Structure formats: C-alpha cells, structure tokens
Swiss-Prot record:
Major location (coarse): membrane
Gene from which the chain derives: atpC
Molecular function via GO: ATP binding; proton-transporting ATP synthase activity, rotational mechanism
Species the sequence originates in: Neisseria gonorrhoeae (strain ATCC 700825 / FA 1090)
Location(s) in or outside the cell: Cell inner membrane
PANTHER family with a match to the protein in the record: ATP SYNTHASE DELTA/EPSILON CHAIN, ATP SYNTHASE EPSILON CHAIN, CHLOROPLASTIC
Summary of subunit composition and partner proteins: F-type ATPases have 2 components, CF(1) - the catalytic core - and CF(0) - the membrane proton channel. CF(1) has five subunits: alpha(3), beta(3), gamma(1), delta(1), epsilon(1). CF(0) has three main subunits: a, b and c.
Name by which UniProt lists this protein: ATP synthase epsilon chain
Amino acid sequence: MSIMQVEVVSGEQKIYSGEATFIVVPTVQGELGIYPRHEPIMSLVRPGALRLTVPGEDKEVLVAVSGGILEVQPDKVTVLADVAVRSAEMDRARAEEAKKAAEAGISQAKDDKALAEAHKALAAAIAQLKTLDYIRSHKK
C-alpha cells in the first residue's frame, strides 16, 4: 500500500501530521483527490471539508478548512490553512451562530481590518457547516 506524509497546519496549531493513503482537498478549482506519487502542484484552498484516508482507520479523518494554500509533492502533502478544525471539535449550533455573527460583522464593519476579520470568521463557519453536512450525508 502506498502512503504519503500529510501535514495540515493552521495559524494556531498543527491539526494533523501523519500518513494517508488518499486525501481530498477543497480547492478553488473544485475538490482535488490526491494519491501518493501525485504530480507536484500548488493550489488555493477554499472553505470546505478536507478528507483523509488513514492506514488502519475505518473512518475518514475530517478537517474543516476555511481557506489557505495546498502544496503537493510526490510523497508529501502540506495544507497551510487560514483556520482548521477537526470534525470532533465541531458543533452545528455554534457554527451557525458564528456564521450569523460573522455576517453581522461584515455588515457593521467600520474599517478594512474589521471587514477582513469578519470575512475570515465567516469562511471558518462555512467550512465547519460544510464538513458537518458531509458527515450527515455520509452516515450509515
């Protein structure tokens, strides 16, 4: 079985560091599926669910990413995410409340910095909601 090293890092912390046999990353071009020995590429990450197939695990490892940069090398994938949260740490009610607060922050922003922070918070909330929707739609 071929494996690759995967690093998912946000500004706050390392979210995942380990091996994977397959990874799906939400990019601005669409969802990108990556197997070991993939051609080198770089892409912008869009808000959504990053999915990892990990050796020895029967369930995918899910991480909500709000944006960032993806770098793929034949034996390593690195995702530098603006914000990243593991699925186990997510809560739908909190994510929906965060989305409402971010939308209010966008409409009430008094300067560019406040507007940028509100957009970042909105992207993080949307990423969590998309990940939670993926989990709900794939429950058995």
